[in-house]
Structures are given as C-alpha cells and as structure tokens.
C-alpha cells in the first residue's frame, strides 16, 4: 500500500521518490551478530541453535529478533537447540488464538490453500497440476481466485523477480503454525 503511493500514476506522490529494494541480511553476518549479542550479555548460543533460528524465521528480522529475544529470556548461560525449540513452540502457542481467528475469516478452500502454501514454504507455480493434486485443491481456475483473495487479505505474499513470481505465507510464525495443522 505504501509503495503504491509512490508508484501508482494516480497516487499523490507518484515518482516523487526513488524506490529501493532492501534484501535480507546475509546469513553469515546475521549469525555472527546473534552470537555477539548473546556474548555481550555473558551468554552463549550454539551454532546449531543459530542455524535453526535463521532457518525457522527465514532470516526475516522481525521474527528472528522475537525468537532470539525469547530464547535470551529463557536461558541462564548457554542457549542450545532444545532451548530454541521450546521458545519457538511457546511463541506459536501464544499466537494460536490469533491464528484461529484468521481461520474463521476464510472459506474452507482458502484455508486449505493457505496450509498447502505453508507446507511448501515457497510456491512458484501456484496453479500447477502437481501442486493442486498434491494438496487436493481443485481446478486451476478456482485456485486463481483463491490466490488473489489471499493476496488481497495479505495472508500471502507475492515476490516478483525476473524469473517470475513466488508466493509464501506473509507471517512467518503463522506459516510455521500452519505447517503443523
């Protein structure tokens, strides 16, 4: 929505600013940063714990910070993978009511499609026969409407590149929760 203020021809700030794309933080840089933050407070965190954090949060800063903060609160001296798993599970349990509320706003087909995307992580061919058959999602024409509806509701995120579009569940924690459904 904010981007449209600057890129849509009928918007008030059309072409009044430069648009920059910000990539995710490099994984190695991020891992070192996490380790340094723990060390600064006289705590340790194992390499496999950091790897899991970055994988599970898809190196998205908001989710990475939230999980790291929770792990930091839980541990006294050293954070191991088991501590991260407990923290991740706790976060998902805390958000369950919110996630279930979203369920009530969707049709059964929208819900099932969202689960399918979450289980895949990233979908590059959202109407392909293989994807639709794997998750019993129906015909490509009806799935296109589902996809557009979930994009409008901002439950799915579309990422465009020169190679094409890819889709994932917008909220990483919601995606991880849906994987368990």
Residue positions per predicted region:
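Conserved nucleotide-binding/hydrolysis micro-motifs of P-loop NTPases
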Residues: 1-2, 25-27, 71, 174
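Sensor-1/coupling segment of RecA-like P-loop NTPase cores
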Residues: 1-10
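Short, flexible helix/strand-to-coil boundary loops that buttress conserved ligand/catalytic motifs
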Residues: 5-6, 34, 68, 160, ...
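Short, conserved catalytic or adaptor-binding loops enriched in Gly and charged residues
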Residues: 10-16
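Conserved AAA+ ATPase "SRH/arginine-finger" region at the nucleotide-binding site
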Residues: 18-29
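Amphipathic alpha-helical "lid/sensor" segments that cap RecA-like P-loop NTPase cores
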Residues: 35-98
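C-terminal leucine-rich, beta-strand-based interaction scaffolds used for sensing/assembly
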Residues: 93, 97-181
């Amino acid at each position: 929505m904010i981007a449209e203020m600057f890129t849509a021809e009928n918007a008030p700030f059309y072409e009044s600013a430069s648009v920059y794309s910000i990539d995710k933080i490099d994984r190695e840089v991020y891992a070192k940063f996490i380790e340094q933050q723990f060390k600064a407070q006289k705590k340790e965190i194992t390499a496999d714990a950091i790897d899991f954090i970055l994988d599970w949060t898809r190196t998205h800063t908001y989710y990475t910070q939230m999980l790291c903060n929770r792990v930091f609160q839980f541990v006294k001296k050293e954070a191991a993978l088991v501590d991260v798993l407990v923290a991740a599970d706790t976060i998902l349990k805390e958000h369950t009511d919110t996630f279930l509320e979203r369920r009530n706003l969707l049709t059964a087909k929208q819900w099932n499609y969202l689960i399918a995307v979450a289980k895949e992580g990233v979908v590059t061919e959202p109407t392909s026969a293989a994807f639709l058959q794997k998750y019993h999602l129906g015909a490509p024409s009806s799935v296109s409407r589902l996809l557009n509806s979930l994009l409008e509701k901002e439950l799915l995120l579309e990422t465009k590149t020169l190679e094409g579009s890819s889709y994932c569940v917008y909220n990483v924690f919601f995606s991880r929760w849906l994987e368990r459904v």
